[in-house]
From Swiss-Prot:
Keyword Methyltransferase: no
Signal peptide positions on this chain: none
EC numbers, comma separated: 3.1.2.12
Organism for this UniProt entry: Shigella dysenteriae serotype 1 (strain Sd197)
Annotated protein name in UniProt: S-formylglutathione hydrolase YeiG
GO biological process, one term: formaldehyde catabolic process
PANTHER family: S-FORMYLGLUTATHIONE HYDROLASE (PTHR10061), S-FORMYLGLUTATHIONE HYDROLASE YEIG (PTHR10061:SF1)
Domain of life, per lineage: Bacteria
Alphabetized Pfam families for the sequence: Esterase
């Protein structure tokens, strides 16, 4: 690993690292916030997944999460949103290819060679964090928009791995909205049955009650993507039918931006702390 940046922050450290990923077949960067040590107990980790057009730095520089993470003693890990590089396939817009990995394992050429963000997040990155930093094995996950989709499917597909999950304005039903249809048809092919493996609503309907974990979702009612791309009511109905412990908060006047995330990130960190710090 190579350290790219390090900054003192709320008595902890904000760092950025590069490493060679064997899963994605390219170099990858991630950012990490290490809170000030309290005792000899390794701190838990919150993974944050960002949305379309983002990289590992958006949350780090815009969300203002470090102050509360330092207070609570929670490590923040921010991976990139896709594989990157000259040899990595790219798309024809902001919503496909680099910066738009959708946190799945692509099966179609030319994407399958590099676009295995699900495996990277499930296996390689946590193992790297565990080996290189003093952290516990307790972790939670959160994200925004495409990253909210990623956080929710990571939690559903890996029962017992995360203590809790949260999201801001997540894509919850990608099989049925333009962003998801475009990405899934390219990454996964035209067989829509294969898409269901990466759709939060489909996964929730197929889930077992004993695998449910506490879930918090915030959605702004002035979000320009609310009706066409996000549709949280569809997930709320799935959660109701499955008795999933989910809180959906509609926040008046808020849009899709990091101003929205910055306004409520403290709530999400304190929500996760209830379960991470047990």
């Amino acid at each position: 690993m190579e350290m790219l940046e390090e900054h003192r922050c709320f008595q902890g450290w904000q760092q950025r690292w590069r490493h060679d990923s064997s899963t994605l077949n390219c170099p990858m960067t991630f950012s990490i916030f290490l809170p000030p040590p309290r005792d000899h107990t390794p701190p838990p980790v919150l993974y944050w997944l960002s949305g379309l057009t983002c990289n590992d730095e958006n949350f780090t520089t815009k969300a203002g999460a470090q102050r509360v993470a330092a207070e609570l003693g929670i490590v923040l890990v921010m991976p990139d949103t896709s594989p990157r590089g000259e040899k990595v396939a790219n798309g024809d817009g902001y919503d496909l290819g680099q910066s738009a990995g959708f946190y799945l394992n692509a099966t179609q050429p030319p994407w399958a060679t590099h676009y295995r963000m699900y495996d990277y997040l499930r296996d390689e990155l946590p193992a790297l964090v565990q080996s290189q930093f003093n952290v516990s094995d307790r972790c939670a996950i959160s994200g925004h928009s495409m990253g909210g989709h990623g956080a929710l499917i990571m939690a559903l597909k890996n029962p017992g791995k995360y203590t809790s999950v949260s999201a801001f304005a997540p894509i919850v039903n990608p099989c049925s909205v333009p962003w998801g249809i475009k990405a899934f048809s390219r990454y996964l092919g035209e067989d829509k049955n294969a898409w269901l493996e990466w759709d939060r609503c489909a996964l929730m309907y197929a889930s077992n009650a004993q695998d449910a974990i506490p879930t918090l979702i915030d959605q702004g009612d002035n979000d320009q993507f609310l009706a066409d791309q996000l549709q949280p009511a569809v997930l709320a109905e799935a959660a109701r039918q499955k008795a999933w412990p989910m809180t959906l908060r509609i926040q008046p006047g808020y849009d899709h931006s990091y101003y929205f995330i910055a306004s409520f990130i403290e709530d999400h960190l304190r929500f996760h702390a209830q379960y991470l710090l047990k």
